[in-house]
Amino acid sequence: MSSQAGSEEKKKRIILIGRSTAGKTTLCQRINNEELHYYKTQTVQVINKNMIDTPGEYLERRGFRGALIVTSADADIILVVQDATAGGTMFPPLFCSMFAGKPCVGIITKADLADEEQIQRAKKYLKDAGAGTLYVTSAVTGEGVEQLVRDLNIL
């Protein structure tokens, strides 16, 4: 192995968790510089070997939450994704505590469609869920995405 290869830091593997239409798949598309288009994630998708995109039903239906825990075992960082324009949240208090001490990062999506009050409410939802660092993002405008990628070392 060359010294250069040995000195490269391993890219982090992330899992995105959030309700249906929270913007998980669209955020993955933006991170990977793909054309943005909506499609419903039906099954767990592994994108570029380091992003795990989960169906919203895994969060929305309590019976599937065990699948989130099992799927998250392959991730280095948990991303809890909250749509800034949503009137509520699916994340119960201390939701992040079920991921065995893995870093839990809060991602607020659709910032381009939200006002400041909605963004602050989304931040509260994610903090209550146990998220540490928070990022305010828009897959449409790119707001916050470059910083997220750089900070989490996911590309």
Q: In which residue ranges do the predicted regions lie?
A:
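A short acidic, amphipathic alpha-helical/loop segment
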Residues: 66-67, 90-95
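Canonical P-loop GTPase G-domain recognition
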Residues: 114-155
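Conserved Switch II/interswitch segment of TRAFAC-class P-loop GTPases
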Residues: 59, 72-91, 101-118
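Conserved catalytic network of the ASCE P-loop NTPase/AAA+ motor domain
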Residues: 7-9, 43-45, 70-74, 96-102
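Conserved G1/Walker A P-loop phosphate-binding module
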Residues: 1-54
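Conserved nucleotide-sensing/catalytic segment adjacent to the nucleotide-binding pocket
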Residues: 39, 46-83
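Structural signal for short hydrophobic segments within the conserved structured cores
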Residues: 50, 105, 133-135
